[in-house]
Amino acid sequence: MSETTDYGASNTGANEESLRMVSSQPIGNEPVSDEELRPHVLGGFIGQPRLKAQLQLFLDAARKRDVPPDHILLAGPPGLGKTTLAMIVANELEVPIRVTSGPAVQHAGDLASILSSLDVGEVLFIDEIHRLPRAAEELLYIAMEDFRVDVMVGKGPGASSIPLTLPRFTVIGATTREGMLPSPLRARFGFTAHLDFYPHEELEKLIERSANVLGVNLDTGSAHELALRSRGTPRIANRLLRRVRDWAIVHDLIVVRPDDVKEALALYQIDSEGLDRLDIAVLNAIVRNFNGGPVGLNNLAAMVGEESETVETVCEPYLVREGFMIRTPKGRVATELADIIFGNYAQR
């Protein structure tokens, strides 16, 4: 399986998020370093059992019919394995994969150039497909449905459109914002898969597999401690495992015990709930400085010394999902769970 990669630039929110150890966005050279941890077959992909069963049936049917499969949309939060699944699909089908992203496609012509160079059966993986320019989306509609692109020849009033037939190929789109995809584009995907956050048990299995690949000898319970801090996200789990590996190397540890995991990640201010410095600062401010809330976003951001957008888009989603905080029309309110953690039992 050959592969061509074109990674686009991240947006501002992603840049803020990427500064955190518990970010679900890639940090630094992670797209490259993660390659060694990626499974190459569907059977080696840990987690998402229902999705795997559906995808296996989908691919088996395409192989038996001896035709490229329908287009695939992979939707879900970042860091759950959408890119890995796209690579697995191409590998299972034994076809090349071309990789690009929505931000990397600046003009419709960029996408037309990629499409016109595809071979029969090739997979085109478009990460962040919801960020394609409108003109590129419209070109992709036709390419996915009719396997052709219309090439403009000439300029001005004399310009004409010449249809260029494309070989049958498969688009795999990945998105963290499925709702931002136009309905005509969504309708052209024959298979849509939704990835969910991982339960601790599945994350432990994934961590143990990654530890074997990286040569990290984890003691009983160590994978569990890592899973607790990984926010249900494989990308975060693998990142934290690498930092624990660094700790083990520096301290000449043959076996990494649970206490070693706790001590190593405490250095990065990550607690057993997966909360980091910013999360703790936000919750601490709501509970102690604002008596549990409600508090407005701007006041909360000023209290923790961050931009309002950073608090809202980078910090709050996890705190709300895990039940530490709720958003109300009057502002942010800490839950009983946050009150207990921060030792505040005052009645509101």
From Swiss-Prot:
Organism this protein belongs to: Bifidobacterium longum (strain DJO10A)
Ligase in keyword set: no
Entry binding sites for ATP: L37, R38, G79, K82, T83, T84, E145, D146, F147, R188, Y198, R235
Subunit comment: Homohexamer. Forms an RuvA(8)-RuvB(12)-Holliday junction (HJ) complex. HJ DNA is sandwiched between 2 RuvA tetramers; dsDNA enters through RuvA and exits via RuvB. An RuvB hexamer assembles on each DNA strand where it exits the tetramer. Each RuvB hexamer is contacted by two RuvA subunits (via domain III) on 2 adjacent RuvB subunits; this complex drives branch migration. In the full resolvosome a probable DNA-RuvA(4)-RuvB(12)-RuvC(2) complex forms which resolves the HJ.
Name of the molecule in the record: Holliday junction branch migration complex subunit RuvB
Coiled-coil regions listed in the entry: none
Family: Belongs to the RuvB family.
UniProt xrefs under CDD domains: AAA
Compartments, record wording: Cytoplasm
Record's keyword terms, sorted: ATP-binding, Cytoplasm, DNA damage, DNA recombination, DNA repair, DNA-binding, Hydrolase, Nucleotide-binding
Keyword Nucleotide-binding in record: yes
SUPFAM superfamilies xref list: P-loop containing nucleoside triphosphate hydrolases, Winged helix' DNA-binding domain
Residues noted as binding Mg(2+) in the record, renumbered to the chain: T83
Record text about domains: Has 3 domains, the large (RuvB-L) and small ATPase (RuvB-S) domains and the C-terminal head (RuvB-H) domain. The head domain binds DNA, while the ATPase domains jointly bind ATP, ADP or are empty depending on the state of the subunit in the translocation cycle. During a single DNA translocation step the structure of each domain remains the same, but their relative positions change.
EC number: 3.6.4.-
Enzyme class: hydrolase
Region Small ATPAse domain (RuvB-S), annotated ranges: 199-269
Annotated segments matching region Large ATPase domain (RuvB-L): 4-198
Reactions mediated catalytically: ATP + H2O = ADP + phosphate + H(+)
Record-level Gene Ontology MF annotations: ATP binding; ATP hydrolysis activity; four-way junction DNA binding; four-way junction helicase activity
HAMAP family linked to this entry: DNA_HJ_migration_RuvB
Pfam families documented for this protein: AAA_lid_4 (PF17864), RuvB_C (PF05491), RuvB_N (PF05496)
GO annotation (BP), single: DNA repair
